[in-house]
Amino acid sequence: DKAVTLKKIQKFSNEYKDRKCKLYVLHGTMKESELTGLYKHPKIKALINISHGEGFGLPVFEAAYNSLPVVASNWGGVTDFMNAPAKNKKGKMKKRPHFANVDYDVKPIQKEAVWEPVLVEDSMWCFPREVSYKKAIRSVYKSYGQHLSKAKKLAPQLVERLSEENQYKLFADHVYDGEDLKDVEYVFVSDMFANE
């Protein structure tokens, strides 16, 4: 996997001899502290995600959680956490993207991407528009302070709303309402469904 990936990146990068940026390949399992170190590194200014779609989008979440500006499409799993309340011009709170939003089209996945039963033939994907993502990246570069401010406003909301404790509670509340479980030390799953 690593050798194939490096070969593809080398071939791709050779097409751009006059590029001004370096390419670094991170491969393999990283510790949480190493990931956080990347997101907090002073030379890392944003996470760019122009994928076809994510489930939850863990790298995007981790970047946002660490107050790193994000460039992404407002589609797929990122909509669960990258849109947060903000005041509009009239002073009302409304959910707004807290990232550099990329325009996109939703189209059927390519035939070569079909992977039954995971990606079925009639699945749809997000296709970010090149002009839009270039514009979004440029915006983050030129107006970095504005994008960093949005990221810093979003991070504490993520920490509060998506903390482990809140997620455990949300999950447990969906599984069982807990009314009959007050002051009980042990609960057996079979007891939850005894009347069904």
Where are the regions a protein language model picked out?
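C-terminal amphipathic helix plus adjacent low-complexity
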Residues: 105-196
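Aromatic "clamp/platform" in nucleotide-sugar-dependent glycosyltransferases that forms part
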Residues: 52
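Conserved acidic donor-binding loop of glycosyltransferase catalytic domains
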Residues: 73-74, 80, 102-104, 108-110
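Nucleotide-activated donor-binding/catalytic signature segment of Leloir-type glycosyltransferases, i.e.
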Residues: 2-38, 45
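A short alpha->beta transition loop at the rim of the catalytic pocket in nucleotide-sugar-dependent
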Residues: 43-45, 67, 74
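Donor-sugar nucleotide-binding helix/loop cap in glycosyltransferases
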Residues: 63
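Short glycine/serine-rich donor-binding loops of glycosyltransferases
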Residues: 57-60
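Short hydrophobic beta-strand element within catalytic cores of glycosyltransferases
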Residues: 69-72, 82-83, 89-95, 100-101
